[in-house]
């Protein structure tokens, strides 16, 4: 049984193919954090399917692409995969060769051609992405992806197991394993050899000498002068050359192993509220900017005897932490960083995590 997971769960882009005789080989591309649940939604076994797939069912999942660090990065990949002609990045690739002219995927063969083109060219070739084949339709791209060092795994929907992650910054969840009394130990024994600051286990580590670096220091070390994304570089300790995406994969494995040793309810750190390990991201959330308060502000409306509004005094939605404090001395609340793809505000995320695969 193969388990696909990551420190914050699975962020994947999948491809479906229709089994209907009316439109054979018709494909659909989408995003999910749980392929097992998503295919049931598309086949109308449970609620939550897509409008475009309600007519041409039943569907089967051919493959999905995992390894994205955040939900936003996976959604961007899904959009480029669905509409390659609208992306300036894909147009630059297509302009170099007549064979790489891409069109919007309507059939499964076109969708696979676009997928291979995206995964074997930067910037996606520099990310720790992988492909999981779930149907025989996707076997023809296996050799092409493996030639360009893209990990390919073959599985079935029955053997597939998805483990949810934790919606929290990695330095809070994975700072250190919790002690017996439930408190989190934030004392770091490792020191970054570049900046000489303490580093937590959520940072990258050399695969040869096990030296641990700050993720920002290592990123600068692995970034070339003519690139913006870290590619490869040498460890300043053992002088061995590594690829940046390989170090991210190892980091993800360590974070997943550390997550399993953390209790299901994470203790609050630095004012953060406790977070459940079983929480997961929805397949699609409404893209909207939310305020720090979910309740709208209410107005204190005073009316005269005839019912005409005499005055309107807005009532602040910010509650006082101490009833003895007067409203005149109330300080404004510290704003939260709002993720437009989430249904509620959350604190700023620390360096992104990547997906890990364990057998």
Curated annotation (Swiss-Prot):
<dbReference type="InterPro" id="IPR050381">
    <property type="entry name" value="SLX1_endonuclease"/>
</dbReference>
<dbReference type="InterPro" id="IPR035901">
    <property type="entry name" value="GIY-YIG_endonuc_sf"/>
</dbReference>
<dbReference type="GO" id="GO:0008270">
    <property type="term" value="F:zinc ion binding"/>
</dbReference>
<keyword id="KW-0863">Zinc-finger</keyword>
<keyword id="KW-0479">Metal-binding</keyword>
<feature type="region of interest" description="Disordered">
    <location>
        <begin position="256"/>
        <end position="359"/>
    </location>
</feature>
<comment type="subunit">
    <text>Forms a heterodimer with a member of the SLX4 family.</text>
</comment>
<keyword id="KW-0540">Nuclease</keyword>
<keyword id="KW-0227">DNA damage</keyword>
<comment type="similarity">
    <text>Belongs to the SLX1 family.</text>
</comment>
<dbReference type="Pfam" id="PF01541">
    <property type="entry name" value="GIY-YIG"/>
</dbReference>
<dbReference type="GO" id="GO:0033557">
    <property type="term" value="C:Slx1-Slx4 complex"/>
</dbReference>
<keyword id="KW-0255">Endonuclease</keyword>
<dbReference type="GO" id="GO:0017108">
    <property type="term" value="F:5'-flap endonuclease activity"/>
</dbReference>
<feature type="domain" description="GIY-YIG">
    <location>
        <begin position="9"/>
        <end position="91"/>
    </location>
</feature>
<keyword id="KW-0539">Nucleus</keyword>
<keyword id="KW-0233">DNA recombination</keyword>
<keyword id="KW-0378">Hydrolase</keyword>
<dbReference type="InterPro" id="IPR001841">
    <property type="entry name" value="Znf_RING"/>
</dbReference>
<comment type="function">
    <text>Catalytic subunit of a heterodimeric structure-specific endonuclease that resolves DNA secondary structures generated during DNA repair and recombination. Has endonuclease activity towards branched DNA substrates, introducing single-strand cuts in duplex DNA close to junctions with ss-DNA.</text>
</comment>
<dbReference type="InterPro" id="IPR013083">
    <property type="entry name" value="Znf_RING/FYVE/PHD"/>
</dbReference>
<keyword id="KW-0234">DNA repair</keyword>
<feature type="compositionally biased region" description="Basic and acidic residues">
    <location>
        <begin position="295"/>
        <end position="306"/>
    </location>
</feature>
<feature type="compositionally biased region" description="Low complexity">
    <location>
        <begin position="316"/>
        <end position="326"/>
    </location>
</feature>
<dbReference type="InterPro" id="IPR027520">
    <property type="entry name" value="Slx1"/>
</dbReference>
<protein>
    <recommendedName>
        <fullName>Structure-specific endonuclease subunit SLX1 homolog</fullName>
        <ecNumber>3.1.-.-</ecNumber>
    </recommendedName>
</protein>
<dbReference type="GO" id="GO:0006310">
    <property type="term" value="P:DNA recombination"/>
</dbReference>
<dbReference type="InterPro" id="IPR000305">
    <property type="entry name" value="GIY-YIG_endonuc"/>
</dbReference>
<feature type="zinc finger region" description="SLX1-type">
    <location>
        <begin position="192"/>
        <end position="238"/>
    </location>
</feature>
<keyword id="KW-0862">Zinc</keyword>
<dbReference type="GO" id="GO:0006281">
    <property type="term" value="P:DNA repair"/>
</dbReference>
<feature type="compositionally biased region" description="Polar residues">
    <location>
        <begin position="269"/>
        <end position="281"/>
    </location>
</feature>
